[in-house]
Amino acid sequence: MQYFQNTNIDFVGKRKFFTIFSTILNIIGIVLTIFLPPQLGIDFKGGAEIAFEFNKDVKISDLRSNLEKANIRGLELKSFGAANQFLVRVPEIETGPDKVTNILQQSYSDQFNIIKIDKIGPKIGSEMFIKALWAVLLAMIAMMIYIAFRFEFVYGVGAIIAIVHDVIVTFGIILIVHHLGILDLEVNQGFIAGILTVVGYSVNDTVIIFDRIRENREKHKGLHFAKMVNLSINETLSRTINTTATTIGVLVILIFFGGPVLQGFAFIMFIGIIVGTYSSVFIASNYVIWYNTERKSVIKDNPSLNTVK
């Protein structure tokens, strides 16, 4: 059974309202970033890594429960390498390794061996943070170039505006959730991976709509551009909602049952996909409408403003 077939919802009729609404959301996101700065993870602010192994089978859930007794905020635990090998990251460069070692000694006595202890200085963490920002920026530029070549340059600009909107709004919501204590979300490599995934997902959603717009420009040449865009959104609505709903369903399961390791990434994806679906319909498409109708009307009345060919 297929849903949302042959719909005729006026998505573009209230585009000015959604433009203002989205602008307000972006302003709020920027203000939150300034006054509620994010908590950087060990990857970006420095810390210590302790790698160790057990000579018996140990559940990572039990190990995490024991390590939490050290009361180290921002502690990260994951398995690596062979069986019963684990890696702990702590933000406390000097005292963190000793706290972890003491807890392991109390809980497991001589049943573990320390493989290595590495320290990540603040300078290295800062360099990694800058590289992560460059990764996000280059991803946006690559997406714009791809869409510009596949469609037109204006479509690439519309996609970039939507992506920037997605990142700012998603980031703002995450800051609120973190500072309210609902989830402990840090800006680390997993966070950046989540943002990049959101960027790719948002662009994919936008490309589907843009592709239908291009098809309908050939099929409905006499139709007003705004109505043609609205038709394209309605025609792709079923695919958009079904894809978003199924993805969100999986993410909800990961948020509640994926454990601390996957919870943050899944939540970022959850928020980002909802925001990205919204921006594909109400941001990217509306910019293309503005460029092809309202902007051209203004230039027609004021030829001196035609600085963009």
Q: How would you name each of these model-derived features?
A:
Residues 1-309:
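A structural signal for conserved, well-ordered secondary-structure elements
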